[in-house]
Amino acid sequence: MAAAAPDSRVSEEENLKKTPKKKMKMVTGAVASVLEDEATDTSDSEGSCGSEKDHFYSDDDAIEADSEGDAEPCDKENENDGESSVGTNMGWADAMAKVLNKKTPESKPTILVKNKKLEKEKEKLKQERLEKIKQRDKRLEWEMMCRVKPDVVQDKETERNLQRIATRGVVQLFNAVQKHQKNVDEKVKEAGSSMRKRAKLISTVSKKDFISVLRGMDGSTNETASSRKKPKAKQTEVKSEEGPGWTILRDDFMMGASMKDWDKESDGPDDSRPESASDSDT
């Protein structure tokens, strides 16, 4: 019996090896359908392959060999799935690297990050802003060059003097305007109702008249100064009128003489000389 059992096993193995390929395909198809229904992940698929392998072990020893042959393709499929996912990631990385490392011409803005035209424009705008800021700083520095904040405590007296001068100038200006208006009104009244005379009078009024009035409103100081100058001018005029005793030293010597009187003036001194000599003899 012991010898018969090994012989039967060998015969069964030979029969299984001689079975047609159709039966093997049917078995593998059934295993694949069971695996697809039960497996949700790669780990579940491995568990399902193990369960099917146990099932076939319990049925027969011959099917054990077939299940082992089927389990190996399951492991290979999982490995292939992992390799395919890694391969797709590597392909994506290679494609992105090619795109990023690709040298594009500057005239064609295909990739905005690699386009240097925009960078040049940004740098140009930045330089223009910096130049504007520098120009503004220079202008402010020029305007604030000689400006000094006044000190209220130290410059108190000078500020008072300046205020007095300003008030005097304003008062003098308004007084001059009022006086000039009065003068013009008086002249218009003197002209009467004739429009021609009024137009002629208004045309004669000019800026110089107002400036002369404004200069005449300097106050008592100008009047006293003018009164002091007048006597000096009179004294000089009197001295010039008296002049030197000898007529030759005068400035107007021979200015009013005519050609017909040339002999008379020359005879005068000659006639006087003998008279003086006769007087001396007597």
Curated annotation (Swiss-Prot):
Q: Name one GO cellular component term.
A: preribosome, large subunit precursor
* Family statement drawn from the similarity comment of this UniProt entry: Belongs to the RRP15 family.
Name of the protein in its database record: RRP15-like protein
Q: Describe the PTM.
A: Citrullinated by PADI4.
User: Which residues in this protein are found as Phosphoserine?
Assistant: S11, S58, S67, S206, S266, S276, S280
Cross-link type Glycyl lysine isopeptide (Lys-Gly) (interchain with G-Cter in SUMO2), residue numbers: K108, K179, K208, K239
**Pfam families for this protein:** Rrp15p (PF07890)
Gene symbol of the encoding locus: RRP15
**Is Coiled coil there in the keyword field?**
yes
**Ranges of biased composition (kind: Basic and acidic residues):** 116-125, 260-276
* Record field: transmembrane: none
Residues annotated with N-acetylalanine modification: A2
* InterPro entries documented for this protein: Rrp15 (IPR012459)
